[in-house]
Amino acid sequence: MAIKAIVMDIDGTLLTSEKKISPKTRQALVAAQKQGLSLILASGRPTNGMRPLADELEMAHYNGHLLSYNGACVTHHGSQQQLFNQTISKSLSQQILEHLKQFDVIPMINDETFMYVNDVFHHTLHLETGDFNIIEYESRGGNFQLCEWHDLAARLNFPLNKILIAGEPAYLQKYHEAIYAPFKETVTAAFSAPFYFEFTAKNIDKARSLEKLTLQLGIAAEEVIAFGDGHNDYTMLEWAGTGIAMENAVEE
């Protein structure tokens, strides 16, 4: 069957190592849209952090869509209308945030405007590429203002699309099962990078949200080509008629 939709993960896939869209990639994706193909960006990023990239790809002009928060939210980019929005309840989010206090991780949550963290000075990850200010990186990438709440669980008063935790890669590999264990029946969790582990509502992932969106668009899975590199892309690449794992993809 002919391809009717292109789905692109963002970090590690659409973007270069400098976090930019290369001119060649931009030209190819705009040309594909001009030919009638639907372009869908699918990311763990918040919606606000995806919009500038969608603008660069002229997606508003060609009826493109954004799957943000690993599929918890689906938005038509041109109208900014939410077609799907699934959150973790406030009470369950509070339980998860309380549970995270016993681990050496950096939880990050957000609303439309602010990103909230326990301690703005507890931000450094020691990666192979050097020390990395993860809070600055994440707030800038999501176009958020930064706000410090010393007790996220106690202060939280709204449901969340996603709970993001950052940590040293070796530490997360060792403890991610213990972090997830109490909530396996109530939420979905996945790595989006070696230093990111993310919670979304139960049965939320990129594949399920893509299936709902493409059904509305009248596009079959066999007519979709998807590109990704992370653990959180696995279901999407399996679901699409053509799934392409990037050269830098994690082994699965």
Name what the model sees in each region.
Residues 23-130:
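Active-site phosphate-binding/coordination module
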Residues 36-40, 62-64, 162, 222-223, ...:
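Short active-site oxyanion
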Residues 6, 66, 106, 243-245:
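Short, well-ordered beta-strand core segments
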Residues 4-19, 96, 237:
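Asp-based phosphoryl-transfer active-site loop
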Residues 99, 103-105, 110-227, 231, ...:
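Conserved acidic, metal-coordinating active-site core of Asp-based
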Residues 19-36, 85-92, 146-150, 201-215, ...:
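Short, acidic loop-to-helix structural element flanking the phosphoryl-transfer center
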Residues 24, 49-52, 174, 209, ...:
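Phosphate- and divalent-cation-binding pockets in alpha/beta enzyme and binding domains
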Residues 1-10, 27-30, 34:
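Non-catalytic pre-domain segments flanking phosphatase-related domains
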